[in-house]
Amino acid sequence: MKLADLSSPAFLENPYPLYETLRRQGPFVSIGPNALMTGRYSIVDGLLHNRNMGKSYMESIRVRYGDDALDMPLFQGFNRMFLMLNPPVHTHLRGLVMQAFTGRESESMRPLAIDTAHRLIDDFEQKSSVDLVTEFSFPLPMRIICRMMDVDISDAISLSVAVSNLAKVFDPAPMSPDELVHASAAYEELAHYFTRLIELRRAQHGTDLISMLLRAEEEGQKLTHDEIVSNVILLLLGGYETTSNMIGNALIALHRHPKQLARLKSDLSLMPQAVLECLRYDGSVQFTIRAAMDDVSIEGDVVPRGTIVFLMLGAANRDPAQFTDPDHLEITRKQGRLQSFGAGVHHCLGYRLALVELECALTVLLERLPHLRLANLDTLSWNQRGNLRGVNALIADLH
């Protein structure tokens, strides 16, 4: 398997046959100078938990775009996001942001998620068919994160466009010049929007997510203005498109396994298990990247210091060495720990909120529209992103 495969039409349509080949080729596959890829569960899990495997974001930018790109506001902004940093700076920033994403805070969002799902369905349930991407799975997480930030819902459309233009930053292949221009403009638009909002919140002392970050302290230190701007943008990115794609991918997986869907409809108490299994089966985030900060030994192999490793989460979730019959969706599967949210110090901070949103979205949809049928199940158009896997449209017949 080669790095170029991650943007090939075959991979975008269905990455799992390529993952099977990757696992068969060995514990690691070389994909370039000082670059490796792995899809085996035990190695992915081991490296995610290894503290000598860290982030090397600006070096990856230098390699892909050259030295001049290091001063671009887009990449400087991303480099302030705690997702891109290593301890101890990562620990400090994550600790501050984490206060808004505890289990208690995430669970408190359940009534809002349920109400949002009902309101969205109210708007389209009388139609004969609907695109669930534009009418349900995309607006649901955006409305919730906007409520958490106390952002005017009328701004959600422009914010979602900007976020979508930023999403290409997470792909392994370099952006084209046009894509780089659009991503830079999107970052500047979001930075300007949230700078204005942050200044308003400083005087209001509210209870929203942005106000919580302004007040958050750990060991007497607060976030700087630029850190708040970058990490609010990160939370918007993480709380929107990844979750919306999860909803769509879960619906596709369930409808491609009608017996499992029927079982879930007959007993919605299985929803928490079903959501986890759908995430294992076809998650939205397909891989993450780590850099060896020192020589790292694992299962008889050595990852040399300075090596970049592509950890294929989607491949690990289908590894038969970890999961029995991994290519089959089984909503009552006795879970081994799935890799959809990563692991270790960079484990997804918002995973609890994502699970709440998924459980509520699917439960309300199945309760309100029990006869819903996906009309384009055999002609799906998958987006052109190597990492954030999802479909461009999901047409459903409602009655």
Curated annotation (Swiss-Prot):
Keywords: Heme, Iron, Metal-binding, Monooxygenase, Oxidoreductase. Its EC number is 1.14.-.-. It holds the Pfam family p450. One of its GO terms (molecular function) is iron ion binding. CDD domains: CYP164-like (cd20625). It comes from the Bacteria. InterPro entries: Cyt_P450 (IPR001128), Cyt_P450_B (IPR002397), Cyt_P450_CS (IPR017972), Cyt_P450_sf (IPR036396). Heme binds at C348. The keyword ATP-binding does not apply. Its cofactor is heme. The keyword Cell membrane does not apply. PANTHER family: CYTOCHROME P450 YJIB-RELATED, P450, PUTATIVE (EUROFUNG)-RELATED. Belongs to the cytochrome P450 family. This is Putative cytochrome P450 133B2. It comes from Xylella fastidiosa (strain Temecula1 / ATCC 700964). The lineage of its organism: Bacteria, Pseudomonadati, Pseudomonadota, Gammaproteobacteria, Lysobacterales. The gene is cyp133B2.
